[in-house]
Amino acid sequence: MNTFCALASLCLFLGTILHADRYAARFAPPPGKILIFAGQDNESTGGTLRHRDGYVDNVGIPGGITHYVYFAEGWTNKYGRTFATGKVDGLNSETEWAAGPMNQKAYLDSPTLDRCVMHLSISMEGNSEDKVADGSYDHLIRELVDFVRDHPEHPFLIRIGYEFDGSWNDYDPPNFRKAFQRIVMALQDANLTNFATVYASSSGATPQQFEQYD
């Protein structure tokens, strides 16, 4: 995943937020302004204690950082990478899935990035939406909630099951809806004020595909 793709996708992603609810979108910039995000892996982004030769170090500090985590315990992707069990992969420690080093906490630990908005996308590939929906992954939801609570100075844009209607994700619509709701309710029940959840369709989806998951 390269930095240019991350910037382009996040500008589009944020634009969707603003147009979807221009009167009440949480963390929206003032009219006429946009937030630029950089990502999508630690090495490409830079600005952390371990990785210091990326976008942040060579171009400048963006308005936000884009990052991905997985709720997919024990699942193996097409590159032969098996995801961690017992924790949200890519959230509190560094890992890699054949797309660069991934560690969200590294950005939060960096004084350089102390004013950045955090975009956190959650993947539930490998039919993991079923386990989120039925409560089997409640320990992962708790880890996510604790993470957001522990960093109240940073706004989080949480994109649950991003591109949910894309064929590459193969999410079951009823279980996806339940999984999305379960994560949102946990964040709301914790009375956190530093997050907004994002319902993000894939760019090529038809209205009929979108409605299946709505």
What residue ranges belong to the model's regions?
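Coiled-coil-like amphipathic alpha-helices with heptad-repeat character
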Residues: 14-17, 154
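N-terminal carbohydrate-binding/catalytic regions of secreted carbohydrate-active enzymes
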Residues: 33-151
